[in-house]
């Protein structure tokens, strides 16, 4: 009998080891997928017509069923290994092909030049070009036969606010549906001078993502803000950014080289976005990639932002280093030159050398073997001080570093002061004022200046995950209140927060100025303040995002689906880019 028990126990041990190994393998695969480059561009073609050999661009017609003529242009090498649309030379050839078609002339609202996704950076965008006999704007409305999908109306951003040349990317077509599109030419007096309706059958999404999300109404009766939510870093949809309207309908599927966008920065009628693990691109309003910034040995990690004039700053990993996710780099937007601004393992070396690599039985087991001792996840540049404020998930600390272009030095740190006691860095900790629990595992920290505050005071807004875990300093055990989560997955008794700190650099203090509760998410997530006062909050582990009113009450929440989590969801009206 004893022998049978021992054999049974041995079998259980083996099974546990197999399960653990399987979990580690799957987790490693998903995490690795974040950095992988797209190995193919799945494109359904129409009827082949000819190849422009001079620029090696293939021409097709009717790649989709439509009541108007729709063209398709593809680089001749699009099926070759290593091909990418995020190549300036490829984009210039496509632009030349498009210009050749435009030069034929004679395009009208009723017979426009229509090209499906001409630059390959989206799956359901329709490029339209035509001229009118009078100055106007083009307003369009998209409907489907599915009565549960509301109509979508927008004013297209053409070359001029009111002009006779109409050229734009039509955003809003629903994947997997026959779409009815009504174009209206509207003059300065608001009169509709002409209109035209056509139909177009759009294919299913390239990613396989559903064309709608489940929406749940909150208690607030406040109005939703205008714009599109854009979801980035859904764990089994790396290489895509999804744009949803206020009803949860997918209105645009952006195709990347890999990775995720992190955020979208507006630059007039262009945007900047991360498009690969080591690429940032500048993209025009019609989807053309105008410039690609190759980061060389650096891999992006979860945030980039504006630097001083003509510069971007980004969080990164130096792939030639033994550590990960602890570098701050700058990118010159004119030359593309990449400069290391801060190596945090050098800046904080006395603490860094006391840390260790992540183990397979730690909270962040999917990073086993990596030296992720700081795990930076958001950055904001403060130009007047040549400083940055960064968020460190691993230490649950917000860090301000000054003189980043000259001699970087720590200015202050905000978090649980006990964490830094005895490390030699306690001198930088600002003092917590008031009875509240400081942030743990925070993301998306933003500095907010307020003219009503005296000099030296400002607010910090953040998504406080309210989750404690540290996998690289195993000798430290914090004293935590029961309100702080330690479960990686959902815990019904724990909530996360949107926190506002009032920072007083003069007094060396911080206090909680305001907060509101949001669904618990141990990792990832973000909180964005919109111009009208509403908030967009993404809780990435339960995979929900919502819009909240100015008092922190939920207006509407959306459920998405991902194998692990969704990194960030933001919202923009994209006026000046896609829309007027």
Question: What residue spans do the PLM features occupy?
Answer:
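A generic "folded-domain core" signal
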Residues: 34-37, 53, 145
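Activation corresponds to long, low-complexity, non-globular regions
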Residues: 41-74
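Short, solvent-exposed coil/turn linker segments
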Residues: 37-39, 51, 294, 343
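Histidine-/acidic-rich catalytic cores in large beta-rich domains
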Residues: 61, 65-142, 163-167, 171-178, ...
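Composition-driven recognition of long, C-terminal low-complexity regions enriched in serine/threonine
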Residues: 4, 22-23, 286
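Membrane-interface motif at the C-terminal end of an N-terminal transmembrane signal
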Residues: 19-42
